[in-house]
Design a protein with these regions (language model features):
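Charge-dense, helix-prone N-terminal extensions
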Residues: 1-105
């Protein structure tokens, strides 16, 4: 399944004007990197992948509709899968903010 171009466009618009953001096709989706660090992606499996502080992941899963991201049956610490909805801007900002806090690559 290809990523949802409408979601990708919404992400693109939310991150517009940030010169540190780069788009990169990967794993059937479209990733948005901040200073070379993945922040958020329009997933090839639908919805959104969001990078968060690994210490906050469990709390976010418990308090939101986010689910842990799994790759090959393993949960990926610091990554959440989210269905795109009205809260998309908050999730994109959460991913952008965390990726911005990491050292540039």
């Amino acid at each position: 399944m290809a990523y949802d171009e409408a979601i990708a466009q919404q992400i693109r618009e939310l991150l517009a004007g940030d010169a540190t953001v780069e788009e990169k096709k990967m794993f059937g989706g479209l990733g948005f990197l901040v200073n070379g660090n993945m922040a958020v992606a329009a997933s090839g499996q639908g919805g959104l992948l969001v990078r968060v502080d690994p210490t906050e992941g469990e709390k976010l899963v418990a308090s939101t509709k986010a689910e842990p991201m799994e790759m090959r049956g393993r949960q990926m610490a610091g990554w959440l899968r989210v269905e795109a909805g009205d809260d998309l801007p908050e999730w994109v900002e959460r991913g952008r903010s965390y990726a911005s806090s990491l050292p540039p690559k």
